Amino acid sequence: KVETGNIPSVVIMNCVAYGNGYIESENGLIDAGNGNGFKMGGSSLPGSHVIINSVAFDNKAKGIDSNSCPDNVVVGCTSFNNENSNVALYTNDAKNTNYRTNGIISYRNAYVKVADNLKARGTQDTAKLYDATDYYWLSASGDAKEASTLLTDANFVTLNTNDVKVTRNANGTINMNGLG
């Protein structure tokens, strides 16, 4: 935070964030917390925080949130059906951003009118933010960077998150058991 300065780079790898912002009770789900999946950064301070091979789905707010950090790195991540942006890379006060992405899949079949929030500033090399392997949800039509490359439900094994059982493989990677 501003009072203490930026922190060293944090690396999140092979992780899953789902259902954040809710607590199960006897009467169903109740609101609790801000509901972000992966929230990386704050106060427009640089940190070069890294998230690799991770999945965010069914969160009350954003799936992957830079939280105003201007230089996050996102590699091989999937974000699906979060109630706010699946992917939000933005800053409030930094003059320049240096986001680096590769292999992002952002997809929805719910909350389809909610686009990803991608805001390059200043000296940002947009090729690093819009890599050819990235699929962002830019509108209700599911636009990718190139309109000829759209994802549909058919691109996924299953999108049923109600029955998914998230486990780990012996090597530590995520086993989504068919989701995605």
List PLM regions with ranges.
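Right-handed parallel beta-helix
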Residues: 1-27, 39-40, 46-62, 70-83, ...
